[in-house]
Amino acid sequence: MGIFSIANQHIRFAVKLACAIVLALFVGFHFQLETPRWAVLTAAIVAAGPAFAAGGEPYSGAIRYRGMLRIIGTFIGCIAALTIIITMIRAPLLMILVCCIWAGFCTWISSLVRVENSYAWGLSGYTALIIVITIQAEPLLTPQFAVERCSEIVIGIVCAIMADLLFSPRSVKQEVDREVDGLLVAQYQLMQLCIKHGDSEEVDKAWGDLVRRTAALEGMRSNLNMESSRWGRANRRLKALNTLSLTLITQSCETYLIQNTHPELITDTFRELFETPVETAQDVHKQLKRMRRIIAWTGERETPVTLYTWAGAATRYLLLKRGVIGNAKISVTEEEVLQGEPVVKVESAERHHAMVNFWRTTLSCVLGTLFWLWTGWTSGSGAMVMIAVVTSLAMRLPNPRMVAIDFIYGTLAALPLGLLYFLVIIPNTQQSMLLLCLSLAVLGFFLGIEVQKRRLGSMGALASTINIIVLDNPMTFHFSQFLDSALGQIVGCMMAFIVILLVRDNSRDRTGRVLLNQFVSAAVSAMTTNVVRRKENHLPALYQQLFLLMNKFPGDLPKFRLALTMIIAHQRLRDAPIPVNHDLSAFHRQLRRTADHVISAGNDDKRRRYFGQLLDELDVYQEKLRVWEAPPRVTEPVKRLSGMLHKYQHALTDN
């Protein structure tokens, strides 16, 4: 496919984007809004953002969800701006500096919350800055300006949502149905690999792919939940399927590890059963029936605990899978499965990374303020706004540098494109609403094609071009003002890029160490006799951390294996029949306190000291288990955990 070719699958969204832009433009001028540009820009960003992230037409619900986040972020930003202006209107410089800190604070929060919700916080940061900068000449108009901005942004979002609904939004349900079936087959094939106990790299690749596919299915569930309330029952089932899928991965990998020391535990009967190849979910269903008959015949005690648990989880998966595909009423049996254990929320391991993002955004905004005041350039304020926009949006993504480059390319492309519209197209079409709408529809259509291809600079070009062409009421054509706006965008993006390069983010290794220590803490916390604590479901949180580790350190198999081993240890200890007495309960609390100290230690020396203390306490704990005559189902997992911590002590304590 050539660089300028148009694929059939890209046309529908391009038309949808063009329709959103035209609708926002028409409504803006029809209701005599002062700056219809904001409504048009909002419609374009809300519609095109999910498409750029997805690399194609976004699923139904994604545009609506992004629109809701933009409304929330705008209102938070407006309230913050009004508060800052009311309290500091007599000190303009201090007011702007506080806005810079607010933008950094919002970026810090957006780095810690869920990725899908971080957009609202990033937006609220630079919205406050835009309002404070814009009303410098007339601060008494702040309430009116804030209301106008909120109104026009809401209009733009409504137009984007209407365009999405008008062109039959793409449902994610069929993809969910296919993936639910495919995931079950892949789970069975992973267990086949683990039973064979073949090449470890092949097994690592298989479980790594399954972790990613399970995370992707959870993302699809979020999209399905946003799509329509009628998928509520399917959404409940998919939540439970996420935990069941992670349980299947854990049991399969533990089966592989068990055979390193006790290959005789997997009998020939089960080896023969798993030699049969499977291609479809129906094949897996047949094999599970055979497996349940074998377990009933051999008895639970003669069946390896990992295979017994795996068969139970796979059976529940099959039960819920049928309900997801048919979206039928939840049966009594399904309700028992869905009334599972409370899911523990994950604690962010990226606090240092979030603090780096805070300083990047704050320093870049302060630098923009100093540049504006020093030069007195009329578009210094525009440059400052672009600095805030780029840093606020770039910091929450995995590669901020490439986001900044995308904005630079986009603003550079917007200069000639905006020049064409400013000098030729808009002056000749402003007398006709039809021609004006058609001209912007053409812009939206072709840039919509490029956005879906994730062309570098396409998203920045769309937003920057709309931002600098004259879409105000009334239209005024001042070339110097246009040129200042275009150059201000370019300078602002370049300054943001420079700050991102200068303020280095060295938090990757620290984040990796914190993640590994959180796995250790989770495994240690599983050693408890507290009934409520033992019922907590840590699997989604642990695998979410593992997924983050895989993204931070792609290809680092030793780290992945260590993390997976800790997850397996957590699950095994959670189900272990630990003797119930006050002596062990008190020591469990001591172990958890020491593990927490390891995570929160401020330097390597303290961390090594607390980690050494944890290892000593584990040795004491093993002795206590022998005194209290704990069964092998308890002592063996604790011994394996202690051995792993001794083996990887340096990886878990050194930066």
Curated annotation (Swiss-Prot):
Keyword Cell inner membrane in record: yes
Gene Ontology annotations of biological process type: carboxylic acid transport
Keyword tRNA-binding applies: no
Spans traversing the lipid bilayer: 13-33, 38-58, 69-89, 93-113, 121-141, 152-172, 370-390, 407-427, 431-451, 459-479, 482-502
One Pfam family it belongs to: FUSC
Function description: Forms an efflux pump with AaeA. Could function as a metabolic relief valve, allowing to eliminate certain compounds when they accumulate to high levels in the cell.
Family: Belongs to the aromatic acid exporter ArAE (TC 2.A.85) family.
Protein name, per record: p-hydroxybenzoic acid efflux pump subunit AaeB
Species for this entry: Citrobacter koseri (strain ATCC BAA-895 / CDC 4225-83 / SGSC4696)
